[in-house]
Amino acid sequence: MKLAVVFLLTTVVFTLAQSQCENCADLQCNSTVHCCLVSTVRLPRWKREISRCGRLAIRRWRCEEPNSNGIYNRNCPCVPGLECREFRRGRRICLPEQSSTSTSSTQGPITSSTVTTQSEATTETETTTAAEGK
């Protein structure tokens, strides 16, 4: 019975791997929508690496950081416009890219001499108007 289950599992894994993308080992996945995923199947006295084309991760999918060789273990990198960031407990997911111009940490501290309150602005306007009216 165990042998039959192992045989069935092996057959399913090979069929899935070949039907996904036969040329992934040669890095011929369509890089605009796919990445190359390489997984290792281990059975008693047998080990095999299976390559397949996986879909690029979209928002909130698990992801891996882009690398130089284009081969990934479990998850593909994010589609353009998203970035792979740590979410919880070491999990990384695709989230919108953070714009560096919108962060307030890049701005310098505000000094008291540069702060103008609403009442000061109103008083200054009234003084200017009265001076022009003379």
Curated annotation (Swiss-Prot):
Domain of life: Eukaryota
Record key words, sorted: Disulfide bond, Knottin, Secreted, Signal, Toxin
Entry protein name: U34-theraphotoxin-Cg1a
Expression by tissue: Expressed by the venom gland.
Gene3D superfamilies per UniProt: Lipase, subunit A
Notes concerning its domains: The presence of a 'disulfide through disulfide knot' structurally defines this protein as a knottin.
Disulfide cysteine pairs (residue numbers): C24-C35, C29-C53, C63-C84
Similarity remark: Belongs to the neurotoxin 32 family.
Source organism per UniProt: Chilobrachys guangxiensis
Subcellular localization: Secreted
UniProt KW Repeat keyword: no
Signal peptide location: 1-19
Composition-biased stretches (Low complexity): 99-134
Gene Ontology molecular function: toxin activity
Ranges where the record places region Disordered: 97-134
Gene Ontology cellular-component terms listed: extracellular region
